[in-house]
Amino acid sequence: LKQVPSCEFFPLEAVKTNVIGTDNVLTAAIDAEVKSIICLSTDKAAYPVNAMGTSKAMMEKVIVAKSRTVSPERTKICCTRYGNVLCSRGSVVPLWIDQIKAGKPLTITEPEMTRFVMSLEEAVDLVLFAFEHGESGDILVQKAPACTIAVLAQAVRELFCPEAETRVIGIRHGEKLYETLLTIEECAHALDLGGFYRVPCDKRDLNYDKYFTQGDQTRNTLTEFNSNNTALLNVEQVKEKLLALPYIQQELAEWEKQA
């Protein structure tokens, strides 16, 4: 389950699907001797403040714990953490296009809110990278750019209807002003792999006696990676990103026919 407001009202359903459901799928895959499993998480799992993000954070814990129970030669289990995939089902750009078609103002939650943005092709690239380079228990993150909601809305308006109005409606249940793909704690162990970060899991076993005498002295070499400190796209850059999407190309073609 990925809809933030829905999970706020039905948190147990988020747990059943995102946490218990993940464990069920992993157990079945291990029993079937599946060689590689890539689980899809979200930036909302880092410093979660809503039910959806919390359930995804627990899902990540299940994935890492499960990876310790099986030899990576038998089954490799990795996790990818995403930002927003542009024009995915239930996302804001298709909503805005529908509002423009209906002659309604574009509804904006908070203009200065920032979000990571990536195309479906870039999302697939992250999964393929995880298959090729991930080790069991890893969390892998792509160095995605971000933009403000105001910039994203302006890009959509300029592509479809520059005279369309906007209306600020306020933040919805469980939303954050910015999202995080890597926490400052994860940055202490994250490996910079060019266009990606790899966060290896903690391989130490559950030996409480060692916890009193041994620790990890690794210090952060990276800062928290969030949608405020990554590269922020301007309107023209967002338009270029949108125009590369087949969904936008199709919607623009239909819109121009009606004009």
Where in the sequence are the language-model features?
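NAD(P)H-binding glycine-rich loop region in Rossmannoid oxidoreductase-like domains
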Residues: 1-16
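Conserved catalytic-site region of short-chain dehydrogenase/reductase
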Residues: 31, 43-48, 85-87
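Strand-loop microenvironment adjacent to phosphate/nucleotide-handling motifs in alpha/beta enzyme folds
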Residues: 25, 61, 65-259
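Active-site helix of classical SDR
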Residues: 55
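A short helix->loop->beta-strand "cap" motif at the edges of active sites that frequently abuts
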Residues: 32-36, 74-75
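SDR active-site strand-loop-helix element
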Residues: 1, 37-42, 80-82
